[in-house]
Amino acid sequence: HMDRVKRSTVIQFTMEEDLNLPEDKPDISTLNLEKGEVVIEEIRPGTDEVTVRGKLGYAILYHTQETGSNLVLLSGALPFEEKIHMEGTLPSDTVAVNGTVEDFTVNMINSRKLNLQALLLLTARIEEIYDEELPVGIQGGSAGEGVEYRISPMEVTELSICKNDIFRKKEEIPLPSSYPNIYQILWSNVSLRDVEFKPQEEKLAVQGDIQVFVLYEAEGEERSIRSYETTIPLNGTLECQGCREELLPDIRYSLVRQEHGQPELTIQPDLDGEERILGLECALELNIRLYEEEQIDILRDIYGVTKEVIPDTRDASLRQLLARITGKTKVTDHRKTDIGSPVLQVLHSEGIVTIDHQETTEEGIRLQGSIDLTVLCITENDETPYVSTREQIPYEYTLNVQGVTGTDQAEVHSELEQLQVNLLEGEELDVKAVLSFSTTVMKNIPLEAIEGVEEQEIDSNVLAGLPSAVIYIAAPGDDLWSIGRKYHMPVKTVRELNALESDELRPGQKVLLVKGLA
């Protein structure tokens, strides 16, 4: 089995909605943080099109001047249904669709009404699994004397396991004793770092880190705002029938988001009944592909010595693993904040790595994009102390892949491995990040597969035109096979006549050929 991308399409579309605050929400003073996430609910392939139904989940944090909490969370989802035109699509096709939010903007119309604008990107891919039947020898009349055939070994990469699965992780995260109890969660962010998959016998090992940030309103009369950030290990195994240690993994993963765009994070009581535990239910959607490298012998060419042998061929394509590459790059930048109030502290930062341009060069795969950065700060303004700023930090990096071409299949996965944002003098942010890129490059090997042969008598004029004996001077690219084909002689005969140990020739080497020897 082998796999390939049958076709892929990318579309952009916009969403806009005026949103009235629910009656139980206090008036808006100023907006603080906003986040949008695409949740795909249904994919329906049709004839030459794919219908995608989903939601734009949103979370909006704002300040209020009313009594009670200073910060208020507003979350929900907006439904959408889009048709993606894909020429050649059939209802029986299996289509994968990924959705991302390219831009999400929230504007305040008045204290009770918001305007939401979003630019969404949908990427649809049809991947197919196919088999290539290739000849390994000849039988019948052509297998006898007077016919030369060449069998060559080839390294191919076969698809051993292909499936989708979900890896689940439940974790209870207790607050340190110095932190007050939780009344309600105002904002949270869950992200993955350094995720790796290792094939084992009948299972997949998963390891990495989960970074958790939570901004919450504490219990008590003051209802103070506190934040807590921690990193917990992501590890475990997933049952995978047929899995073996020697298989090569190419696994794409994504964090399952709830309707509001975040994994499930709840408040749970501890043994004393106090609300001091964060309950995290984390689910990873996995697109699992495990490959196996194998050497196979293929009939590549055939010609006749005493008769004309005409092969019937068709175009075929094999896959070969070129490289499994991971590369990292550091990105640093200084950004002047445009917050308005003097900043006291950087409370939290989060970012998403986007690849805007991918190009194959002589050095490898050149990537250009940005880190979409959100920074939450505490300011001197007592009425609206929490303020956020968004920045785009550009990067450029080349994954060093020797021998890659534009026809090879290489899907690059990007990850924000480290992020540190510090406050400098003069309201300037110092950004330091480490980006990680990984890809599995599959080389497409086109070849002509021999499906059959037709035998004919050799034209007597062709045989008559061959010299009785000749000294042939090898040109670049010549070998005994090409010479034997040209002069209708067996390769073994030419080799023995010239006392050669191999079929390879160097340019300018002299080869004696005698007509009629077999």
Go through each PLM region and give its residues.
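Extracellular LysM carbohydrate-binding repeats and other cell-envelope/extracellular binding modules
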Residues: 489-518
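Membrane-lipid interaction segments
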Residues: 1-466
